[in-house]
């Protein structure tokens, strides 16, 4: 009887191993493309996994080219930062490829405020200047580093992170994402610049402030 149970146990273990080996893996980025090219038809409605493909006969070489990040955007704003995004909307050839890129410029002391990308990890390549890049984990631990020209820093998917110009002059970097639509969530705006407005009581209790103090903060984000 013991021998019989041992055989059954070995069979069950073998079945479990085979099943685990053949089980589908959880996707950690955009779904892989099912054809060589699928240039976005920007006139069509967006689908869950990207834009529909434009007819192959209508595809041209320029669909796979983009110069959106060549020029430095103006950084004349309270944060001293501006970004130019080369996502699928501006770069149709990215459709279904699971890629996008952003150029960000920072004035001296400029800050790209804490934010997250819920659908992508981010690889930062500094083009010029000195940029402190940092992210926080779910355990409230901060990882940060001053990144200089041609150096890289990676931010894991979905984590809050920031970029601060700590150099004497302007700074610029590109951020590469493993999604054609990484998404952007900035907590400051998500709390103080929502439409309709976040209830005052929620903000006052969250930040242990009086409503007059919350109102003063909200007034700074009017128009964002």
Swiss-Prot record:
This is Germin-like protein 1-2. Glycans are attached at residues 82, 170. InterPro entries: Cupin_1, Germin, Germin_Mn-BS, RmlC-like_jellyroll, RmlC_Cupin_sf. The keyword Glycoprotein applies. Residues 1-29 form the signal peptide. One of its GO terms (molecular function) is manganese ion binding. GO terms for cellular component: apoplast. Residues 67-215 form the Cupin type-1 domain. Belongs to the germin family. Mn(2+) binds at residues 115, 117, 122, 161. Pfam families: Cupin_1. May play a role in plant defense. Probably has no oxalate oxidase activity even if the active site is conserved. It is found in: Secreted, Extracellular space, Apoplast. Keywords: Apoplast, Disulfide bond, Glycoprotein, Manganese, Metal-binding, Secreted, Signal.
């Amino acid at each position: 009887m013991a021998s019989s149970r041992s055989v059954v146990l070995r069979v069950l273990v073998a079945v479990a191993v085979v099943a685990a080996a053949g089980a589908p893996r959880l996707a950690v980025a955009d779904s892989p493309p099912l054809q060589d090219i699928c240039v976005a038809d920007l006139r069509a409605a967006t689908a869950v996994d990207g834009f529909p493909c434009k007819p192959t006969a209508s595809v041209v070489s320029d669909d796979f080219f983009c110069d959106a990040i060549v020029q430095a955007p103006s950084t004349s704003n309270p944060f001293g930062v501006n970004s130019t995004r080369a996502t699928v909307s501006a770069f149709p050839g990215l459709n279904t490829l699971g890629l996008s890129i952003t150029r960000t410029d920072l004035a001296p002391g400029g800050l790209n405020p804490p934010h997250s990308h819920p659908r992508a990890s981010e690889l930062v390549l500094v083009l010029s200047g000195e940029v402190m890049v940092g992210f926080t984990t779910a355990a409230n631990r901060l990882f940060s580093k001053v990144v200089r020209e041609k150096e890289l820093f990676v931010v894991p998917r979905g984590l809050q992170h920031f970029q601060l110009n700590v150099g004497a002059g302007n700074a610029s970097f590109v951020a590469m994402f493993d999604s054609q639509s990484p998404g952007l969530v900035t907590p400051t705006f998500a709390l103080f610049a929502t439409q309709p407005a976040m209830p005052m009581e929620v903000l006052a209790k969250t930040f242990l402030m009086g409503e007059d103090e919350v109102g003063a903060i909200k007034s700074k984000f009017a128009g964002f």
